[in-house]
């Protein structure tokens, strides 16, 4: 039957599943066609185990019933007297034709007149059960009570949930995990994590964080900065110019092999040529392509977390976003991680920062699916009013059933662990969070060490005397009598030009002092810059050069910096020596200073203040530039020296 979306969806299942389900569907239809006046054949009880276990989970099955003419009633799907028997027959024949083709026999699904399929027997009495809102319900299978209506939207919702719950098992493939691990500079990341943990311990003597917590932070930063890239529209494959979205293209066999059922057409009007953008859903392929939008980002990032041995789960938001959660053993809770934003532990980012109208957010791991909507909202009544796609009792029982099936072969200890974690989550969900003005959804709770590790407080500078970086002349710089340093914000790297192009990775590593500062990447605008942390009234950053230890003194200095402000934001630049302080503009031009002559110390400082409203922190920025300007530097200091 042309245009039957239900049959098309049904045909996407494996042959084994299709044959089982199609037999049931044909039987339901044949019972009505042969016995048009028998009411019992016009009704299917939703609580019937045959329906709930064999039809409900299968893609397209329930849609076929709706296309036949069945309608939802309170406890049943009913074929009303007003429904078209001819329409039912057409859908039935379409399914039968596909079944014949798959069986390779012409008489397997014959017409109703010749059919020998017995009528569907009367279903057994329903099993009594009651919906429980308690966490224990997640650990035991409880059939959905017959009073819960089942709708086409329920079928769509369940299919999405089951698809995601099945997909996360891909991350558990040992060979795929090994392949992913080979893509990660894990030794470097673990080294950085140890250093970050040391800084957290310095900031808070009572720090109870673990190395894995820091590893997550470094993995997020590396993934966004060095591994994966965002795609709006791909450049033209012929001229490299801009393209415009222009519908979809048919997926190739290779696309389908890598689970890309959708291929976007990015069209170049100059070349009149299409560039294909397959939306791969197979994380193995994403290790190769390393690009996409939030779906590809979260899919690949979750795999990398599992490859590193982190407990991770894939988070699906029904308002069209996905991300990851990682379980922190030290904090005994699930931590929000958004690789697109390089955001960690900021669950209110979407509702408060982005203004999203949330409704359903589900978490999927190899052992469990959970409704975690309430972690991501501080407006619970508003969210509840929007949760109308499925009934709450139906959702609860569906999740319980899926968990019971997935966990049936787990050991008692693991089951108890999952249950205990669920209890902790439920307690967390009871009290909605209250973001403070200017947080932009950033989490200000948590230990001082945790906030310091994430760069969200000036506490990371509490031990400034032991963390200050001072540049002193190397032997080659002493010989050339010249010091030259640059910083590239896109690569987040310093280049010590005068010392054999020595590189220093990380904006903090070349700084003397920093206070309330962080590096921000905007994937929507494709821009990057340094700014003060969210909620901070000011930010400060300085760089120091001292040539006295090398027996040298300064003759002159030149500085080039660039800053950008919006609304009432301000950036004040200054250059200080042992005796004087001079202010200068951050206009991107090279400014020379002769008044440094004879001095031995030089400090360049930027102070960021002002701005309006909740995004005031964004209104004063250092070194703002495109993420595509990989060679551009907007910070440069040159010092000419002579012997003392």
UniProtKB/Swiss-Prot annotation:
Cited InterPro entries: Galactose-bd-like_sf, Papain-like_cys_pep_sf, PAW_sf, Peptide_N_glycanase_PAW_dom, PNGase, PUB-like_dom_sf, PUB_domain, Transglutaminase-like
Subcellular compartments: Cytoplasm
Organism: Danio rerio
Parts forming coiled coils: none
PUB domain boundaries: 20-81
Positions annotated as active site in the UniProt record: 294, 321, 338
Record-given protein name: Peptide-N(4)-(N-acetyl-beta-glucosaminyl)asparagine amidase
Similarity annotation: Belongs to the transglutaminase-like superfamily. PNGase family.
Main location: cytoplasm
Reaction catalyzed: Hydrolysis of an N(4)-(acetyl-beta-D-glucosaminyl)asparagine residue in which the glucosamine residue may be further glycosylated, to yield a (substituted) N-acetyl-beta-D-glucosaminylamine and a peptide containing an aspartate residue
Cofactor note: Binds 1 zinc ion per subunit.
Protein's gene: ngly1
E.C. number(s) listed in UniProt: 3.5.1.52
Comp. bias regions, Low complexity: 127-141
UniProt keyword Hydrolase present: yes
SMART domains given in the database record: PAW, PUG, TGc
Top EC class for this record: hydrolase
Role, per record: Specifically deglycosylates the denatured form of N-linked glycoproteins in the cytoplasm and assists their proteasome-mediated degradation. Cleaves the beta-aspartyl-glucosamine (GlcNAc) of the glycan and the amide side chain of Asn, converting Asn to Asp. Prefers proteins containing high-mannose over those bearing complex type oligosaccharides. Can recognize misfolded proteins in the endoplasmic reticulum that are exported to the cytosol to be destroyed and deglycosylate them, while it has no activity toward native proteins.
GO BP terms: glycoprotein catabolic process; peripheral nervous system neuron axonogenesis; positive regulation of BMP signaling pathway; skeletal muscle tissue development; swimming behavior
């Amino acid at each position: 039957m042309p245009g039957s979306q239900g049959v098309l969806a049904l045909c996407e299942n494996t042959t084994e599943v299709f044959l089982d389900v199609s037999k049931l569907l044909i039987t339901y239809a044949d019972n009505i066609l042969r016995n048009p006046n028998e009411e019992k054949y016009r009704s299917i009880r939703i609580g019937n185990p045959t329906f709930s276990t064999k039809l409900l989970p299968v893609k397209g099955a329930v849609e076929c019933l709706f296309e036949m003419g069945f309608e939802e009633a309170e406890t049943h799907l009913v074929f009303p007297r007003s429904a078209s028997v001819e329409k039912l027959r057409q859908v039935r024949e379409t399914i039968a034709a596909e079944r014949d083709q798959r069986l390779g026999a012409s008489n397997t699904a014959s017409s109703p007149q010749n059919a020998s399929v017995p009528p569907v027997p009367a279903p057994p009495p329903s099993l009594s059960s009651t919906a429980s809102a308690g966490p224990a319900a997640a650990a035991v299978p409880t059939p959905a009570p017959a009073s819960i209506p089942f709708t086409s939207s329920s079928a769509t919702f369940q299919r999405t949930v089951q698809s995601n719950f099945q997909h996360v098992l891909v991350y558990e493939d040992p060979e795929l995990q090994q392949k992913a691990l080979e893509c990660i500079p894990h030794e470097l990341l673990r080294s950085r994590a140890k250093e970050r943990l040391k800084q957290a311990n310095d900031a808070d003597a009572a720090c109870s964080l673990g190395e894995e917590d820091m590893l997550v932070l470094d993995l997020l930063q590396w993934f966004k900065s060095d591994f994966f890239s965002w795609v709006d529209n791909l450049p033209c494959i012929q001229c490299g110019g801009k393209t415009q979205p222009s519908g979809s293209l048919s997926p190739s066999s290779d696309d389908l092999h890598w689970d890309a059922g959708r291929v976007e057409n990015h069209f170049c009007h100059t070349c009149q040529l299409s560039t294909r953008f397959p939306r791969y859903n197979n994380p193995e392929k994403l290790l190769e392509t390393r690009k996409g939008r939030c779906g590809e980002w979260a899919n690949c990032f979750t795999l990398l977390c599992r490859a590193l041995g982190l407990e991770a789960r894939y988070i699906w938001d029904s308002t069209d976003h996905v991300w990851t959660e990682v379980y922190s053993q030290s904090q005994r809770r699930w931590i929000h991680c958004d690789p697109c934003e390089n955001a960690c532990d900021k669950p209110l980012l979407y509702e408060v920062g982005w203004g999203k109208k949330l409704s359903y957010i589900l978490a999927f791991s190899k052992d469990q699916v959970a409704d975690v909507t309430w972690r991501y909202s501080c407006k619970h009544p508003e969210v509840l009013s929007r949760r109308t796609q499925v009934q709450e009792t139906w959702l609860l029982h569906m999740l319980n059933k899926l968990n019971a099936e997935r966990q049936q072969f787990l050991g008692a200890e693991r089951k108890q662990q999952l249950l205990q974690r669920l209890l902790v989550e439920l307690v967390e969900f009871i009290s909605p969070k209250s973001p403070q003005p200017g947080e932009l959804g950033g989490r200000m709770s948590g230990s001082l060490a945790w906030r310091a590790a994430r760069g969200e407080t000036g506490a990371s500078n509490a031990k400034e005397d032991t963390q200050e970086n001072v540049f002193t002349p190397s032997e080659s710089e002493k010989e050339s009598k010249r010091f030259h340093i640059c910083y590239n914000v896109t690569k987040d790297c310093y280049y010590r030009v005068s010392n054999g192009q020595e590189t220093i990775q990380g904006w903090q590593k070349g700084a003397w002092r920093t206070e309330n500062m962080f590096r921000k990447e905007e994937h929507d605008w494709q821009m990057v810059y340094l700014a003060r942390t969210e909620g901070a009234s000011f930010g400060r950053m300085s760089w120091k050069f001292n040539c006295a230890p090398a027996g040298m003194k300064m003759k002159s200095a030149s500085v080039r910096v660039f800053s950008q402000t919006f609304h009432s934001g301000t950036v004040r630049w200054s250059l200080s020596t042992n005796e004087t302080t001079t202010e200068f503009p951050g206009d991107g031009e090279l400014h020379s200073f002769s008044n440094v002559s004879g001095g031995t110390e030089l400090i360049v400082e930027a102070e960021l203040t002002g701005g309006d409203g909740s995004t005031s922190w964004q209104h004063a920025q250092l070194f703002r530039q495109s993420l595509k300007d990989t060679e551009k530097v907007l910070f440069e200091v040159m010092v000419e020296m002579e012997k003392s």
